[in-house]
Amino acid sequence: MKDKKLLFDRKCHVLYSQPCKKEIRAKIALHYPEAERETIWEQVQRQYADFLSDWRTDLGGKMNFHNGVGGTYDCIAIMSYYTVCKAVTSFREIEEMEENLILPTFRKLKFVDCNKPFWRKLIYRAFVRAISGCDKWHDYEMSVAPYETDKPIYYEFTSCPAAEFAIRHGLTDIMPALCNVDYASMELLHARLVRTTTCVDGCRCDYTICGDKDPYLKEHPEYRDEAGFRRNR
């Protein structure tokens, strides 16, 4: 089915991004014979439209930067793929799909080094600027702790539309595969993420960010929990 024929309210919702569509169709091609691929893709498209039929209409559509590549609506598209193709896909495949959407931007920033005060302060300012967008749409409710020299950056989300969506539709089992990219993205900035909880299984997503050489990391070793979340002690 052509994207333009997909029925959902385009005044308040957005279509999945083209990179996301490419990822999903590539995975479908891995798992299904050629004669079935268009049918499976159409099932994913219809699932996406069905999910949007009773979804929040206040997330800003194209105006909200969280709805771009790898963002809220791409997560819904990936969950649509997971719903249709659960029998053939895997946790790692879903994790890889989100990485392929998010990480290219961070790879372009490989010159950033969070170990250096200059870059750490710029990273902090980027998070502070993001608050205005969150406050405008009230999608990801965000707060950032005051900056302290030689201490990790800290911010948190107390609401997350992707987590809210997954909880509503019984898809929390795949959320770790979508959330773990936060760790991989920080690693590309010579940084590390320290996290203890998420909006999926707690009241917030916490982000403590420090340079990859920071002694703070020794106090908070990383592990994977039973659900597949990357976490820290």
Segments the model singles out, each with a brief description of its role:
Residues 162-164, 212-219:
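Short, charged/polar, Gly/Pro-enriched secondary-structure boundary elements
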Residues 184, 222-233:
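Short, cationic low-complexity segments
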Residues 206-208, 219, 225:
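N-terminal functional module detector in eukaryotic proteins
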Residues 73-168:
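Amphipathic interaction/junction segments at domain boundaries or subunit interfaces
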Residues 65-67, 166-169, 224:
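A short, structure-level motif marking secondary-structure boundaries and short turns
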Residues 1-85:
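N-terminal, charged low-complexity regulatory/assembly segments
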Residues 196, 202-212:
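C-terminal edge-of-domain segments
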Residues 141-201:
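Short, hydrophobic/π-rich interface segment
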